[in-house]
Structure formats: structure tokens, C-alpha cells
Amino acid sequence: MQELVPNQGDAWKFMLEQMDGVFDNLSRKKIKIDKLPNVDLFKRLKINEIPPEIIDWVGLSLFLRVQTLALRTAEMHIALGSDIHETAFTPTTYNGDYTVWLKNRLLYQFQNRLNIIENSLHKLDGMALDLAHQFLENKKLIRKHFVDFDWTKMKSERIRIHGDFHLGQVLVNGDDFYLLDFEGEPESTIRDRKVKQPPLKDVAGMFRSFHYAIYATIFNNADKYPFEQEELFKAGELLFKYLVGAFLETYIEKAQSGNLNIGYSHEINFLLK
């Protein structure tokens, strides 16, 4: 039995509704996508550092909600990494054993995805086919990126994490959020789910969920927004970078103030990538 949490649905549904409004604003407010200011991915952004043109387009309220989600995410990680007595939850450093486990797992998952794509090429066309070929052309580079991981350069710590963190694992409660479903990745073994990992893996999972929500909105409303698909993609990527920046600023500030060792800027960016 679990306690009932009063809620207005999950954050995935909430974000889709928000994204629809944001893309609708492009035409409603006659926004010129090419004129919107750009920003680097993973650049931390306080609210007052977000250009007024972006605030006018996206709306202040969405950035404030993203900040709240970031705060709750950091609080979750601080709680999971604060037990110094129970060894199953004590923070730990990177080591050779973890690196072997990580590389084997990544390469196994990568090969599975590779096989799926190779066996599905005949079903694809258009942009999906182009992206599939692009992925296959870069498979050696991707594999090398995994193999070259060097744990000796990592200064942050690993903890028990959520493990399957995305918008669907979050309930909306007024202006706040509840995080739930801590059982980890469904496709992972119980043993693998217990492996301590960088908390930024959860953060990256949430960012991927932001990205999915943006593109689900574009693809599911193709006839609604009076723009070429490429223009919507450009707006979507820009929106993604600003949401990520607002999330990171709040998350990193709270995590570091709670003595959660997530590393310095270079390591944070490396792990997120």
C-alpha cells in the first residue's frame, strides 16, 4: 500500500500542455525565431539572466516551475546521499570495478540499439532514415567515447540514485512536484539498480524527457503551428537549452549547498554529455 498523493496528473502531461502553449506563442505573438537570442547548452541561467525576449515567448511561470523541479531533484539526491552509516547508501568515489561495469553495460545497450536500427532500416523513411544512417555512420565514434571513459579524472562521488528519472515519474501538486517510482530502470537487474551512479545521470534523464516533450509537441501538432518543421526544430532546440540552463542553476546551487559532491563545471558538463 502507498499513501495517496493529491495531484493534478503527472509532469509529462503538464509539460506537453506547457509546450503547446509555448509553440502557440510563436504565431500568436508574431515571434521571429531567427531573432531569438541563443545560449550555450548547459550554461547555468538565473531567471534574471534569461533574455526578456525568451521570457516573453516562453513565459516566466514555466521557468519558475522548472526551478522548483530542479530544487526537488537536488533535495532527492541530497537525501539519498546523506546516509553515512548504511553502506548501501554511503557516497563513494569512482574506481576500476565501476568502470568495468559501466563500460560493459553501455556497450551492451549500445549494441542492442544498433541491432534494432539495422533491422528496422527498411521500415524508415524521410528524416527518421537520415537520422538512422547518421547514427550508424558514427557508431565507431560513439563506441570509442564509451571505451575512453577514464575514472581517474573523476573527482565527484557516486550515490544511489532514482535510476529512471523522467517527467512521467513526477506528480504535479499545485505549484509543486512529488517524485515517485524509485524502483529503477525496468530493463535493469536488481543488482544493477543497486549500483551507485552519478546523480547527474538522473538530471540527464530529466533533460532527455524535456527534449522528448518538445519534439512530441512538434510532431503531434504538425498542422497546428504555421511554421516549417525546420523552424520549429530550431525553436525547440533553443527552448531546450534555456530550460536546461534554468534547471541547472537551481540544481547545482542546491546540491552544492547540501554538500553533494557532483564535481566542478567541467566534470558536470562531461557527465551530462
Predicted regions and their residues:
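Amphipathic alpha-helical protein-interaction segments enriched in hydrophobic
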Residues: H266-K273
